[in-house]
Curated annotation (Swiss-Prot):
The lineage of its organism: Bacteria, Pseudomonadati, Pseudomonadota, Gammaproteobacteria, Chromatiales. This is Intracellular sulfur oxidation protein DsrF. Not known. Could be involved in the oxidation of intracellular sulfur. Coiled coil: none annotated. Belongs to the DsrF/TusC family. SUPFAM superfamilies: DsrEFH-like.
């Protein structure tokens, strides 16, 4: 009997700190990947701040978990998207975001940055292709 692989999309809409949504979303993404599900992560609205470089949480007394995002590729989370309109509305560009890289262990091919900035039409396509969409 073969295992059923579901396509899970995780929408990250909240700022990285101030609530537990961003941290919990990251945990759920890693759990989905650990169970070999087809995981897609989309950052939109204030969620785009989760991927910004140089986060410093000393002043707010919270643990900075942003370095964990850079390891997503190593956990076989290879479909990572950022909504272009959300970036532009916040005065950000892809250059402001962390790079998520990984090495394919089978082919030894290296991928420098798998974060893809997409438009709203592509966001809709990805949602329609997903078996389940979780919003945080």
């Amino acid at each position: 009997m073969s295992e059923v692989v579901k396509k899970f999309m995780y929408l990250n809409r909240k700022a990285p700190y101030g609530t537990i949504y961003a941290w919990e979303a990251l945990e759920v993404v890693l759990i989905g990947a650990a169970f070999d599900q087809d995981v897609c992560v989309l950052f939109l609205d204030d969620g785009v701040y989760q991927l910004t470089r140089g986060q410093d949480t000393k002043g707010i007394g919270m643990k900075n978990f942003s370095p964990t995002y850079r390891t997503l590729g190593d956990y076989e989370v290879r479909r990572i998207y950022v909504d272009r309109d959300s970036l532009e509305a916040r005065g950000l560009t892809q250059d402001d975001l962390v790079e998520i890289a990984f090495e394919d262990m089978e082919t030894e091919e290296e991928f420098d940055n798998i974060v893809e900035v997409i438009d709203s039409a592509r966001v809709s396509e990805l949602m329609n292709e997903s078996d389940a969409v979780f919003s945080f």
